[in-house]
Amino acid sequence: MITMIMSILKKINLLIRDFFRYLYFLINKGGFYKIFFLENENTYPYLAEIIKRNISRKKRILIFSQDKNIKMKISLNLPILILETNFFSEIFFLTLKAKYLISTTTDLDTSTIFKKTLNKKCRYIYIQHSHIGLINGYREKAFINFDAVQIINKYQYEDMKEINKKYFKKIKRFKFN
């Protein structure tokens, strides 16, 4: 009984903390040009070079994560928003104002929290972190809601062509070295 009560109190504490983090973000931070979504600390190495290349530009950048340990991984002087609850993370995704959202997470609009924003001007870019095929290695519709997908081999290139054809999409393919 005490364990259950402690668990409930911990969840309530997380909700309250996320509420104030999100409120602070809304009041003080405003819109961003690019938002990098780091699902957890393990995805940072795949986005690190892209983030560093974007720092020198005069555009506002935000790093968003659900992993509270991400701050220890990142030594860059960038704003970091951490929302640990799915509830506030979903609200963040639905209301974000940015030109680009860059992520290594698939299943945009088909997962529990990773949703497209109500702001139709935001472009979603998927950064590849695996050499596996896009059709056999992921869920069937894992990429159909992205605007651009990084391709790192010829198999992924062919898979992306097939996905575009099957779902009548025009998802851009690009290579990043």
List the model feature ranges, each with a label.
Residues N69-A142:
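Extended catalytic core of nucleotide-activated donor transferases of GT-like folds
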Residues F36-N42, F64-D67, S103-D107, Q128, ...:
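Structural motif
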Residues S7-F19, A142-N177:
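A nucleotide-sugar donor-handling region in carbohydrate enzymes
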Residues R53-N54, K116-N119, K141-F143, K165-F168:
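Short, surface-exposed basic-aromatic patches at helix termini and helix-loop junctions that form
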Residues M1-K97:
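N-terminal pre-catalytic "stem/leader" segment of glycosyltransferase-like enzymes
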Residues R60-I61, Y124, V149, R173:
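Hydrophobic/aromatic residues located in beta-strands of well-ordered beta-sheets
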Residues K58, N77-P79, K121, F146, ...:
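A generic structural signal for alpha->beta connector loops
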